[in-house]
Amino acid sequence: SVSVVEREEIPKGFTLVNGLPDVGLVGVLAVSHLVSSLKMEEVGSIESESLPPLVVLHGGLPRSPIRIFLKDSLAAIVSETAVPSEAVYSLANAIVKWAYSKNAKLVISVGGMAVQNRQNIEKPKVFAALTDESLIEMLGASAEVLQEGYMVGPYALILKKCLDSEVSGVTLLAQSFYNYPDPEAAAAVLESLEKITGI
């Protein structure tokens, strides 16, 4: 099972941004940058026996590999470890259940979408998948709605569970390299995130 541990009380009504390891490490790069640039405070973690037996060290101190940060009404989840396939369902479920219990205004997952000709793309485009059409207006010109296709992995399940729980959810995916880190894709997705949230 997966549990969300709040080290201190997290106020309700936040916007939640998820950065999990994925294609081009786009989500982790983008949300880690967000956390450091906004000086977000670490307020909790996600714990599970299904996750690899590891801790990350920051300032010499052990930390959970999946941590929760907060600044004003913006919360962020960053994972510094890949999520094993056997933990994906329970992790997605725990994140959305927690967001629902906290009356989250919006759950935004950010990541990459591998494209073959990435080296020829100067500025990666950002695409969006949404839980409902009313969010299209909010997107504006920040991202192009993915009309057809499919998604796999944690973000697919988070979006589906948001839909099932009637939590507003958006997944932002930037065109990226498949097999190595893509900071330009992370920058593109951050730009879209800034337009949507006004951060």
Regions found by a protein language model. Give the residues of each.
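N-terminal short beta-loop-beta anion/metal-coordinating cradle
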Residues: 1-81
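Short beta-strand segments
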Residues: 18, 77-78, 109-111, 173-175
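Gly/Ser/Thr-rich loops at beta-strand to alpha-helix junctions
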Residues: 20-25, 83-86, 112-117, 178-180
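Short, solvent-exposed amphipathic alpha-helical segments in soluble enzyme
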Residues: 32-36, 92-95, 187-190
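Secondary-structure boundary elements
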Residues: 41, 96-107, 163-168, 196-199
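Surface-exposed cleft-lining segments at the edges of enzyme active sites
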Residues: 81-84, 145
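Internal, conserved structured core segments that host functional sites
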Residues: 85, 89-135
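Catalytic cores of processing enzymes, dominated by hydrolases/peptidases
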Residues: 116-196
